[in-house]
């Protein structure tokens, strides 16, 4: 709750605090997520839009999902100094691309979903982002969504390849493991 009223925080601290919004999107009551006030800090605002977008995607509310994507695209975050971590800005790009992929999947646009998820995974897997924190700064390996988009388009071999790549980076990811087992059966 403090993150919603705080007016100053280093971008890296905001990125770490964003995990709270990721958890809310996954586990909290959708009405509670949508009722949360917009934070004042820019990177937390991006995480807030992401959480709301995930709720809208789960509810099939494509209008709401599109509004959250548009809000992320319109965000103007002051550039970091040259010595600063790129991870906070990368997080904003990841959440925007993940929601873009969710929208494309909801609309049956498999190639667009693949493009969005692949781009998000590539950012998530950069050295700057991967080395930023342990556990990883983003809550799940986006490459598994890329695999899901490939599978939705009928590309089982591509999905298998991407799930195996996911498990090289996060060997115990339960969703990627289950998806890979499902392909084998």
Annotate the PLM regions.
Residues 19, 47, 51, 92-95, ...:
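"A position-specific structural signal for the A-helix of alpha-solenoid helical repeats
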């Amino acid at each position: 709750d403090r993150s919603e009223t705080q007016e100053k925080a280093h971008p890296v601290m905001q990125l770490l605090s964003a995990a709270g919004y990721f958890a809310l999107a996954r586990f909290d009551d959708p009405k509670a997520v949508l009722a949360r006030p917009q934070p004042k800090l820019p990177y937390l605002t991006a995480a807030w839009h992401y959480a709301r977008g995930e709720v809208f995607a789960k509810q099939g509310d494509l209008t709401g999902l599109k509004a959250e994507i548009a809000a992320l695209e319109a965000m103007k975050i002051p550039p970091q100094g040259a010595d600063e971590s790129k991870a906070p800005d990368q997080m904003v790009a990841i959440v925007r691309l993940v929601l873009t992929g969710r929208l494309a999947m909801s609309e049956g646009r498999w190639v667009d979903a693949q493009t969005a998820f692949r781009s998000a995974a590539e950012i998530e897997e950069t050295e700057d982002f991967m080395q930023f924190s342990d556990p990883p700064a983003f809550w799940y390996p986006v490459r598994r969504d890329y695999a899901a988009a490939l599978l939705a388009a009928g590309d089982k071999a591509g999905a298998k390849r991407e799930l195996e790549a996911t498990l090289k980076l996060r060997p115990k990811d339960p969703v990627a493991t289950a998806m890979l087992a499902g392909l084998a059966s």
